[in-house]
Amino acid sequence: MKRILALVLAALTAVVLLASCGGSAKYIVLEDNFGAEEYAIGFRKDDYALAAKVQEILDEMSSDGTAGKISETWFGNKDAFLTGKEFPRAMQTVDGDNSLQYVLDKGTLVLGLDESFPPMGYRDSKTGEVVGFDIDLAKEVATRLGVELVIQPINWDAKELELNGKNIDLIWNGMSITDERTANMFLSKPYVANAQIIIVPEGSAIKTRADLAGKKVALQRGSSALEAVQADEETYNAILNGGEIVEFDDNITAYLDLKSGRVDAFVVDKVVGEWIIKNN
């Protein structure tokens, strides 16, 4: 998997270098989008003790300025880390909840992520290490918890299976809060604001969601981008009327297809999409 992603990232770099010779196409974010949302960390549905402790540490990091420094490193803005938010679902105390002790006893906190989701968590093509905003936050949480952080790349479409099967302890990777996820997991307080945006080549005839009718639209399989498009029934049905929703395992590959002209538009998290445009 690591080798495949490395090849994909290398291919993306090659595309960008080729495009820079003789005038490269530019890509823009449309003002119209599929709505605002927020990111949260996902825990197993009844792992309240672990969730409470991780949130307590994050609140401490917010108060002592650590979260702000990490935010400034990745976003150039200390205020990108949200404060004053509430849990999407009420915190509870459950008899027999040993979720925190389970992590402390094994000495590791296993973080599940899609390793191609910059700048939240992604594999650096130069060092081979997984880095990102979420990774830096999680490293500090693990240090204060007194355990080792283990980063476990997963198939994003199977994230809940990985979580409930105890292959990972939490999902921490720019995961958008949705009603379905709130019902199936226990979510932390929101910590980053986001939106589902539309990216197109500069000069494209696509100016709004309505213009996606009959077009090929790229997005990540199992993502909140897909959920957002499907939730907008009018736009979704218009796309399928002569067009196609093209699903990819990761956002980098989806972006490659946009650059190659195989799709007409790319729907993706604002945080990720803006990073891709800025860095490529």
Protein language model annotation of sequence segments:
Residues L50-K53, E60-W74, T93-G174, E247:
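Extracytoplasmic small-molecule ligand-binding "clamshell" domains
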Residues N33-G35, E56-N98, S224-I245, K278-N280:
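Ligand-binding clefts/hinges and TM-proximal coupling segments of bilobed small-molecule sensing domains
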Residues K2-G22:
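Sec-dependent N-terminal signal peptides of Gram-positive bacterial secreted proteins and lipoproteins
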